[in-house]
């Protein structure tokens, strides 16, 4: 069970206004029920639009009105069994820090005040 934001990504430089957050989510054993986006480092979550709902992998989109402030964006997915993609901390607690092969924790991207994108760990 994993989702990842593919846009915006490292190397992009955003301008204030509407930003398309898009990505990909998948499950190895069942269908994806929904994808959620956080624009405040995981404090709150909003439902993203998903496409190809009938299969175990989906594309997702979310429109975010970025006001030029530094923020952290994340995605997480939920499958038909109501399992929620774990946080990085939950994966490390369960599997240790060297669990790179099956690492399915939530990935975080910082949008800096100047619009640059940076991959971070939280």
Walk through the language-model features, giving the residues of each.
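Long, low-complexity serine/threonine/glycine- and acidic-rich segments characteristic of extracellular
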Residues: 2-122
């Amino acid at each position: 069970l994993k989702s990842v934001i593919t846009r915006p990504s490292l190397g992009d430089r955003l301008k204030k206004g509407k930003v398309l957050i898009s990505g990909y989510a998948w499950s190895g054993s069942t269908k994806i029920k929904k994808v959620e986006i956080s624009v405040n480092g995981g404090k709150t979550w909003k439902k993203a639009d998903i496409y190809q709902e009938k299969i175990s992998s989906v594309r997702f989109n979310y429109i975010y009105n970025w006001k030029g402030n530094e923020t952290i964006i994340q995605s997480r997915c939920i499958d038909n069994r109501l399992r929620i993609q774990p946080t990085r901390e939950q994966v490390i607690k369960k599997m240790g820090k060297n669990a790179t092969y099956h690492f399915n924790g939530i990935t975080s991207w910082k949008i800096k005040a100047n619009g640059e994108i940076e991959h971070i760990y939280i």
